[in-house]
Amino acid sequence: MAIKKSELYSSLWASCDELRGGMDASQYKDYVLVMLFVKYVSDKYAGQPYAPITIPKGASFKDMVALKGKSDIGDQINKKIIGPLAAANKLSDMPDFNDPSKLGSGQELVEKLTNLIGIFENKALDFSKNRAEGDDILGDAYEYLMRHFATESGKSKGQFYTPAEVSRVMAQIIGIREARTTNDTTVYDPTCGSGSLLLKVAAEASAKVTLYGQEKDTATAGLAQMNMILHDNPLALIKGGYSTLANPLFMGEDGKLKTFDYVVANPPFSDKRWSTGLNPLNDAHERFQHYGTPPAKQGDYAYLLHIVRSLKNSGKGACILPHGVLFRGNAEADIRRNLIRKGYIKGIIGLPANLFYGTGIPACIVVIDKAHSIEHGAHTRKGIFMLDASKGFIKDGNKNRLRDCDVHKIVDVFSRRDDSDPKYARMVGLAEIEKNEYNLNIPRYIDGSEQEDKQDIAGHLQGGIPEADVEALHAYWDVCPNLKRTLFSPLPLGGRGAGERAGYLHLTVDKQAIKSTIYEHPEFASFVERMNAHFEKWREQASVALRTEIQEFHPKELIYRMSEGLLNWYADKPLLDKYDVYQHLMDYWAEIMQDDCYLIA
């Protein structure tokens, strides 16, 4: 019987975590992920003469299984499996499977590697006969394990992984989904880590694009290479071992920095060693020449300026940075002013705190668009669109996480420049920014603070419900106007004469009867009936679509169509937040429906 994706992933994690022993998660991940990679490429490409990945004879997963229990298993894996596989495919910095300092020595090492191989003999991981659309399962398993390792790795060691939800936001706001992409379309991440951000951008494109990534840590660059292959991007070009700032490895034929259509990045926050190996005042790539030199101990703008320089004249980019870049003074204020004046900054998105592995500080996404900049002759930038998404998240263990509805709302509002809710987002004109001395701190422009409860002293002393408090619920009275009159009536003056006390209302039903009065009121009952009928109509249409597509479908495409349809279905319905309805479907998909669809597909 086929195993569900969720069960497969949790089983993999539980087994791997059990075998880890005292090894640091940041080290153990290399062994687990390499093992998963060997299993995947062996199933998919072994014996294929023209495959994009070469599996040397004697270097497949089956050959690794044959080494189980042998006293020299670690040395043999290095020599017969990992070495030839890495050499044939130019994979860098693979882990040492015969390292006693990490895996133990003697029988301990033999048992640990034997058991680790056994985990990946799971029949559910046999993808040699799977259809193409099923390949996502191993790629997703790789990302699942990386996310858990990032959580376990602690401060600074989890930075190889950008949370998938944040990556999705960045991939969508740069507009690659709407663009006419081809194989010549280029996407670059100068600090690519494990490559998850690059892959999310590639997944949004309508056609296959060409991916480039540089990562200073060679072991992490190796993870990125494997991640590309597992997600069916074997031709992605990943280079490692050098700092992007000191030694950028992607150069054009003219000797200058290679430029790209899209650039995305999640660089190390406030990198204090950004200038190591680099003379910023004499930068051969002229990244700081027209903007200013970043502070010696704050490398945030160094990475952002590298992105600007690496974009084509029509290029678009997005970079995750700490909020300090928006308001810090001195050299950074000069750089910020120059970037704004050139029209490069399209938008700022404030994210919730504690989203990222390795740090709890809040961050923002700085969105770059060269196409509408002054420098390139298209001076159409009238302002900067600012969005405060800091309150939209859910607790997930010891971290915060963006929900599907949070991601969708951010992308919708940003893409449409929707400023109907000024507490969430607004277009800030350049004149206003200039008036604030080019300070981009989001709270200066968006007041996202919760309104304090107004204390009505007269109401406290003399009784009565302030009419303003009742009117604040106008959305409900628009739907049920007579319900308001059923619940409230003008407050009489009492012993102070005939008439009514202006501005105050009286509750006409007992407090314990409020809920039943609302539920039994004909207007509310009618509203509930209409909403139930509205949902039932959508459910019937969705059921017909599911039965029609059951013969051949891709689960991810299916849920995308269904969820987008549901979102539009509730777009204009009163009292119901369409994003809340959307989240209910996405939760159901994640918990139940996704597994069933992958079993059927």
Regions found by a protein language model. Give the residues of each.
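Glycine-biased, low-complexity coil/linker segments
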Residues: G494-G497
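Hydrophobic alpha-helical scaffolding
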Residues: G106, R131, G213-D217, Y262, ...
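Conserved S-adenosyl-L-methionine
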Residues: S156-A265, S270-Y291, Y301-A302, L321-G324, ...
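Conserved P-loop NTPase
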Residues: I365, D369-V411
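Non-catalytic, mostly N-terminal accessory regions of nucleic-acid modification and defense proteins
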Residues: M1-E178, K239-L249, G350-A353, R381-D388, ...
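Conserved Class I SAM-dependent methyltransferase catalytic core
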Residues: E7, S11-A14, E18, Q27-F37, ...
